Design a protein with these regions (language model features):
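Hydrophobic anchor at the start of a short beta-strand
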Residues: 29, 108, 142
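Extracytoplasmic/secreted proteins, especially bacterial periplasmic and envelope-associated proteins
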Residues: 3, 7-10, 14, 39, ...
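C-terminal catalytic histidine-bearing segment of alpha/beta-hydrolase fold enzymes
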Residues: 129-132, 136-169
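Accessory recognition modules or surfaces
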Residues: 1-6, 98-111, 121-122, 153-166
Length: 169
């Protein structure tokens, strides 16, 4: 039904089932994702649409790097650049991550840059700031880092103001 969420759940299931072999703690795992993947990871953090629906343990934390909170604002750009089909409309545009936040949501480390042109194109205030606000309102443990001169697609941020964010998380 939702291939990206199914992929995340299969990965979590595989890793937790092989926890001893991989030397990981299956009861306290984190999901790290960037950009649109950050939205997918965020939806996975919702019990109804994510981890519980797919019968895997709840994430111990979500690390969301410059996530897309509200894809509906991206629709004009995606329509212009890509062949947007019904599947994408159903699984991306219908989810606004901040609307899925609830008090039992996993703890979140959220970061993004003020110079992120993609987030600006998609309505900057409706992305990271809106997600942070929802986390705050629902009392979800979280940390937000906003970097001045950081754009989109920089991964772990080597050579940027965001360098070291992964250690901070």
């Amino acid at each position: 039904d939702n291939a990206p969420l199914e992929d995340v759940s299969r990965a979590v299931r595989y890793i937790t089932e092989h926890a001893e072999q991989f030397h990981v703690q299956p009861e306290d795992y984190a999901v790290l994702a960037y950009s649109s993947g950050g939205q997918i990871a965020g939806v996975f953090g919702d019990a109804e649409k994510g981890w519980q629906k797919y019968n895997v343990p709840k994430p111990g934390a979500l690390l969301l790097a410059y996530p897309i909170n509200n894809f509906s604002l991206a629709k004009p750009a995606y329509t212009a650049l890509l062949d947007v089909d019904d599947w994408m409309q159903k699984h991306y545009y219908d989810y606004t991550l901040s609307k899925l936040i609830a008090p039992d949501y996993p703890p979140v480390f959220l970061w993004y840059g003020k110079s992120d042109r993609i987030l600006k194109l998609f309505g900057f205030d409706q992305q990271g700031p809106a997600l942070q606000s929802a986390l705050e309102i629902d009392g979800v443990p979280h940390e937000e880092k906003v970097y001045e001169d950081v754009g989109h697609g920089i991964g772990i941020g080597l050579g940027t103001d965001a360098e070291g964010w992964l250690n901070a998380a």
